[in-house]
Amino acid sequence: MTSIRKTHPLMKIINNSFIDLPTPSNISSWWNFGSLLGICLILQILTGLFLAMHYTSDTMTAFSSVTHICRDVNYGWLIRYMHANGASMFFICLFLHVGRGLYYGSYMFMETWNIGVLLLFAVMATAFMGYVLPWGQMSFWGATVITNLLSAIPYIGTDLVEWIWGGFSVDKATLTRFFAFHFILPFIVTALAGVHLLFLHETGSNNPSGLSSDSDKIPFHPYYTIKDILGALIMILALSSLVLFSPDLLGDPDNYIPANPLNTPPHIKPEWYFLFAYAILRSIPNKLGGVLALVFSILVLMLMPLLHTSKQRSMMFRPISQCLFWLLVADLLTLTWIGGQPVEHPFVIIGQLASILYFTLILILMPAASLLENNLLKW
């Protein structure tokens, strides 16, 4: 008799996705991050749900309600810091997941890749709006600065900003709608993640060699379920350590000061995971140019399949491309550092050079290196 997991309409989907899924036998731990991102998403939705039970999205009480959660709600401090640091863990996994895709040529699955880029945008939007909710100084001024960027759009910019604000400044209407969007977006992210998986399972996973693995597949369970559980345990250990030992390590002290429209903080900066994009934005003196560079810094990922000039899919056997890839990683770390620094010499010029290098590497140097490697191999 056939097992129920292979016949039942719902169980069949789970079976084909997580149990009997044919998986390449040689995928490394870099392939763990998909499942880790799923765990992060579930964790964020659950902790967020419990926070929403106690949070009030009103300018007069938002800051106090977060304080109330931390002081008076049973394990409220734990839920709050799991949610805040869970976002950091989410982005660490996201960046590593995207980096893996770039290194091993996973972007050649175009539908999967493009939905992944949309997911990145959606998660970034969710995180930005979530950062506004505690209504501290950095929440308020971050919201003011970032929403104001839309005023750079010619003709409709100013009207668009006021429409998003729901008034002439960031106020009660803004906070309420940001809470509404912050609540709904994770469910949209979940749906997109489902579509992401759907397209991935149409082609099957890529593998480190970049070659077809049709001749050597193994079932996902038990081999990769146990491997994913190990990855999950390591991630949960790291997150728990962060939450229980130094929960404010990645936060901004200014956010413990209630929002005050009359007092601008000396250095307005977003959370650490947006600093690279913020540095690119600031490196261009023109407002519209900066906004376009900011958007294109993420959107450029969608061009990766078109910029792939190598005859090999993966970078595993391409040393020149490997060097450029790690230069790109170093450049992104430099941009992250610069994004958190004040706008003064020498940080301005370092940021401008790092921004130029970022786009030059992706659009010119990496495709050129791939062509050079093809010639060296006489392909």
Curated annotation (Swiss-Prot):
Record-linked SUPFAM superfamilies: a domain/subunit of cytochrome bc1 complex (Ubiquinol-cytochrome c reductase), Transmembrane di-heme cytochromes
Record Gene3D superfamilies: Cytochrome Bc1 Complex, Chain C (1.20.810.10)
Positions contributing to a ubiquinone binding: 201
Keyword Coiled coil: no
Membrane-spanning ranges: 33-53, 77-98, 113-133, 178-198, 226-246, 288-308, 320-340, 347-367
Membrane topology: Multi-pass membrane protein
Molecular-function GO term, any one: metal ion binding
The UniProt record lists the keyword Transmembrane: yes
Binding site for heme b b566: 97, 196
Record key words, sorted: Electron transport, Heme, Iron, Membrane, Metal-binding, Mitochondrion, Mitochondrion inner membrane, Respiratory chain, Transmembrane, Transmembrane helix, Transport, Ubiquinone
Note: Heme 1 (or BL or b562) is low-potential and absorbs at about 562 nm, and heme 2 (or BH or b566) is high-potential and absorbs at about 566 nm.
Function comment: Component of the ubiquinol-cytochrome c reductase complex (complex III or cytochrome b-c1 complex) that is part of the mitochondrial respiratory chain. The b-c1 complex mediates electron transfer from ubiquinol to cytochrome c. Contributes to the generation of a proton gradient across the mitochondrial membrane that is then used for ATP synthesis.
Family: Belongs to the cytochrome b family.
Quaternary context: The cytochrome bc1 complex contains 11 subunits: 3 respiratory subunits (MT-CYB, CYC1 and UQCRFS1), 2 core proteins (UQCRC1 and UQCRC2) and 6 low-molecular weight proteins (UQCRH/QCR6, UQCRB/QCR7, UQCRQ/QCR8, UQCR10/QCR9, UQCR11/QCR10 and a cleavage product of UQCRFS1). This cytochrome bc1 complex then forms a dimer.
Descriptive protein name: Cytochrome b
The organism of origin for this protein: Scapanus latimanus
Lineage of the species this protein comes from: Eukaryota, Metazoa, Chordata, Craniata, Vertebrata
